[in-house]
């Protein structure tokens, strides 16, 4: 998926129209960072991605990072929200027992490479991964 052309045309009407939304997003992100309670974990935590959704390479990048850390001998776990999955709560994906409509297609794919936790709340997923011995958690 390519970035929209208007991203590179600062004087286009689309860019001008979206500019106030960009300022609002920036303000809300700043305020969230200032008012939120920082969470501390005992493992390296790396978040892959940003506002872009679908087709930007987040899953292949996550798999490549997992492979990199696995080759260094580290215990790597991935935490995913399980987009479009039916299951609730926090659980470890088992590629032999779960189906894509239950856990989401990307967690199921990534579970072929390393341990993957599905949790709508990231902090619960990270806590479960740490309890299971994760040294590196990829979000």
Q: Language-model features: where?
A:
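A transmembrane-helix-recognition feature enriched in membrane-embedded lipid enzymes
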Residues: 2-45
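Residue-level signal for inorganic ion chemistry
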Residues: 24, 59, 110
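Walker A (P-loop) phosphate-binding motif
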Residues: 30-96
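P-loop/Walker-type NTP enzyme "switch/lid" segment
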Residues: 80-139
